[in-house]
C-alpha cells in the first residue's frame, strides 16, 4: 500500500491531534493556490496552459476567436506583470480558487526536511489517499467545474514530463469546446469577458497540478478542492509572516499510517509522548519511526 507524506511541524501535528472532530477526522488547512510557498507557482501553471492553448489551436486549425489571443491583445498596451495581476484579481473576485494540501511520495527526504520539515525539526505524516471524501451534493458557485464524490489527489506534473500533454488534453479539450460555443453566441464586444471566464476555468483546472521541473525532486502529490458555496474561507499568518486564505478539509484519522520523526528531533522522548497521545485518541497501527537522514543544521 503506497502512502503519501505531509511534512509539517510538531506544533501543527499537536494541533491536529488536539482538534480531532467528533467524526474522528483531522481538520487540515487547504491553502489558496495563490498563497502557496512559491508565489510564481500559479503563474507558471498558467503559462503552461497558455502554451497548450496555442498548440491546440494550431492543431485544430482554429483561426478566429482564439482563446489564447487574449494574451497577445492585452500585451499590446500592458506589461506581462499587469496582465498577471489583472487575471489573478479576476479569479479572486469570482471565487475561482483552488485550495490545495501538498504531499510527497517520499517519506524521508533531506531537501523536504529542509524546505517543509522545519529544518529537520518536524515530522512526516504518512496517509492512505483513499477515503478522502466530500459530500456528493455540494456545489460550486458560478463555476463550470463539477465535483466528484472524492477530493482530487493527483501527482503533480513537472514541465516536460512525458504525460503532461495527456493531462492537459484530458483536462482542457472539453473546456475549449465549451468556450467556442460561448464565443460564437456573443457579440465581439463581449468576447473579452468570455475569454477571461474560460481562460480562468482552464487555468484553475490544470494549474494546481503543474510545477517547474526544478522541483521534480519533491515527487509531489496534491489534494485539491475548489471552493463550494458553503465553504467558509478563513485567514491566518503563515510561517513566513504572510496573510493567507484557506478552507478546512476533514481527513479521517484512520488514514494516518505512519509518523516519521525528523532527524533533528529527540526521537526517544518525542516517540514516547506521541504514543501516549495516539493511545488516548484510539489510533490503531500507526508506525512511529526515526528519520534515517544524516542531517546537519546550519
Predicted feature residues:
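Partner-binding and oligomerization surfaces adjacent to conserved cores of proteins
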Residues: 1-298
Amino acid at each position: 500500500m503506497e502512502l503519501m507524506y505531509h511534512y509539517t511541524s510538531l506544533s501543527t501535528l499537536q494541533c491536529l491531534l488536539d482538534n480531532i472532530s467528533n467524526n474522528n477526522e483531522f481538520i487540515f488547512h487547504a491553502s489558496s493556490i495563490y498563497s502557496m510557498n512559491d508565489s510564481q507557482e500559479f503563474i507558471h501553471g498558467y503559462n503552461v496552459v497558455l502554451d497548450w492553448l496555442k498548440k491546440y489551436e494550431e492543431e485544430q486549425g482554429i483561426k478566429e476567436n482564439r482563446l489564447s489571443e487574449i494574451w497577445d491583445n492585452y500585451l499590446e498596451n500592458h506589461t506581462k506583470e499587469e496582465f498577471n495581476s489583472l487575471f489573478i484579481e479576476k479569479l479572486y473576485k469570482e471565487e475561482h480558487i483552488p485550495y490545495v494540501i501538498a504531499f510527497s511520495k517520499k517519506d524521508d527526504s533531506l531537501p523536504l526536511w529542509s524546505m517543509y520539515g522545519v529544518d529537520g525539526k518536524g515530522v512526516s505524516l504518512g496517509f492512505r489517499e483513499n477515503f478522502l471524501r466530500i459530500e456528493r451534493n455540494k456545489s460550486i458557485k458560478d463555476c463550470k467545474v463539477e465535483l466528484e464524490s472524492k477530493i482530487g489527489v493527483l501527482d503533480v506534473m513537472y514541465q516536460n514530463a512525458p504525460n503532461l500533454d495527456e493531462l492537459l488534453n484530458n483536462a482542457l479539450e472539453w473546456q475549449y469546446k465549451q468556450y467556442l460555443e460561448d464565443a460564437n453566441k456573443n457579440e465581439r464586444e463581449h468576447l473579452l469577458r468570455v475569454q477571461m471566464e474560460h481562460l480562468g476555468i482552464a487555468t484553475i483546472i490544470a494549474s494546481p497540478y503543474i510545477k517547474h521541473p526544478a522541483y521534480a525532486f519533491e515527487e509531489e502529490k496534491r489534494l485539491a478542492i475548489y471552493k463550494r458555496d458553503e465553504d467558509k474561507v478563513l485567514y491566518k499568518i503563515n510561517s513566513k509572516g504572510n496573510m493567507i486564505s484557506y478552507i478546512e478539509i476533514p481527513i479521517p484519522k484512520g488514514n494516518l499510517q505512519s509518523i516519521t520523526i525528523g532527524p533533528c528531533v529527540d526521537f526517544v522522548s518525542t516517540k514516547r509522548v506521541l504514543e501516549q497521545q495516539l493511545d488516548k485518541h484510539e489510533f490503531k497501527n500507526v508506525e512511529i519511526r526515526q528519520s534515517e537522514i544524516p542531517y546537519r543544521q546550519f
